[in-house]
A protein has these predicted regions:
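A glycine-rich, hydrophobic/aromatic-adjacent loop/helix-cap motif
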Residues: 340, 362, 366-369
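N-terminal export/assembly segments and adjacent metallocofactor-ligating motifs
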Residues: 1-329, 334, 343-347, 355-358
Length: 369
């Protein structure tokens, strides 16, 4: 007979139904998993979503697959004729078929696919699927991704140089101002919502950009009701205001971004060391000293400047001597600022539906120092 403590228990763990991995307590009564509750003692266990709470239903659902099934009738037949097989047979059959395809058509003829780890229980398996794909010799990976995933993972790769992993936790605990742009963590990621709510109680300010006043937008200091599909106009306007009024960290831009690197006026590409001299390195980008006007090389491999970087210019046009003659260039930060100025504040407001007084007045009242 099983011990009563084994039949009734509260087991700490985490929810594996998405990449958030929220801390949980599994409730077992009479040997049956009956509930999944949040675990406040866990860093991400302040709350769990409806999908997590439905875990017992998934475990005991009558249609849950418990073992491999093999089709015994042709595709298109109303009755597939599923037949239970062993794991050994399933793995051997799959491996044999993959080897046949590789022998006949090459490994590149096979594509591997995986569900998004953000909304499924595959977050622990995705890296192994990719490892199998590369060991097999195929470059073809098809994955599903939510609309928000492209901005989070791919846009950050271009902005910061590295994609943000799905299970990342922003430093909401110490943030003075939080901006949620098209993001409702009450639905998408409860751990972010609870951390943001805690930050608001501490005194942090919240700005929400969303057509709908949903979730934490109801508690925001500033809600910008952008017209759907016009976010770019609002982003240009906000950037324009911040640059023109100096509401950004100048030192951070100089030190930690490519803002000082020179952009060629003739082709819009970054100026490189190979443009300056025949023996110059293509891995070297070029900035300009604000006080002397002399070029300062940046080594992208070493991740540092090769000269004095204390007063790099972030604005203005400079003429750089090249073997082909003088070439007009401007710092990347000024290049971006100029692009933002091409649309006036009034034009941007008319496009996105957010009043210019909100973009300027309310934003300035809530900017972070």
């Amino acid at each position: 007979m099983a011990d009563a403590n084994e039949l009734n228990a509260r087991i700490q763990g985490y929810c594996a139904l998405c990449v958030s991995r929220c801390g949980t307590v599994a409730v077992v009564e009479n040997g049956r998993f009956v509930a999944l509750e949040p675990d406040p003692s866990h860093p991400t266990g302040q709350a769990i979503c409806a999908k997590g709470r439905a875990a017992p239903e998934l475990v005991y659902h009558p249609d849950r697959l418990l073992y491999p099934l093999k089709r015994t009738r042709p595709k298109g037949d109303p009755d597939p004729g599923w037949q239970r097989i062993s794991w050994d047979e399933a793995l051997a059959t799959t491996a044999a078929r993959l080897q046949q395809l590789a022998a006949a058509h090459g490994p590149a003829s096979v594509a591997f696919s995986a569900a998004s780890p953000s909304t499924s229980a595959t977050s622990d398996a995705t890296v192994w699927i990719e490892r199998l794909m590369r060991a097999f010799g195929s470059p073809n990976l098809c994955v599903a991704m939510e609309l928000c995933g492209w901005g989070r993972f791919l846009a950050t790769r271009y902005t910061y140089g590295s994609g943000v992993p799905g299970n990342y936790m922003p430093d909401l605990e110490h943030a003075g101002c939080i901006l949620f742009w098209g993001y409702n963590p009450n639905i998408a990621r409860l751990v972010h919502a609870t951390a943001a709510a805690k930050a608001l109680r501490r005194g942090a300010r919240l700005i929400v950009v969303d057509p709908r006043r949903a979730g934490l937008a109801n508690k925001a200091d500033l809600w910008l009701q952008v017209r759907p599909g016009t976010d770019a106009a609002l982003a240009l306007a906000i950037t324009q205001v911040m640059v023109e009024r100096g509401w950004y960290d100048h030192e951070f831009v100089r030190t930690w971004t490519n803002g000082p690197l020179l952009v060629r006026s003739d082709n819009g590409r970054f100026l490189r060391g190979s443009d300056l001299t025949p023996n110059g390195g293509a891995q070297h980008y070029v900035a300009c000293s604000e006080s002397t006007g002399a070029p300062v090389l940046y080594d992208s491999g070493a991740g540092r400047y090769l000269g004095d970087d204390g007063d790099l210019a972030c604005f203005g046009t400079v003429e750089v001597a090249t073997p082909q003659g003088k070439l007009a260039c401007q710092p990347a930060f000024d290049f971006v600022a100029e692009a933002c100025r091409r649309i006036s504040l009034a034009e941007a407001a008319a496009i996105c539906g957010v009043g210019s007084e909100q973009i300027v007045g309310n934003w300035s009242a809530r900017r972070c120092a």
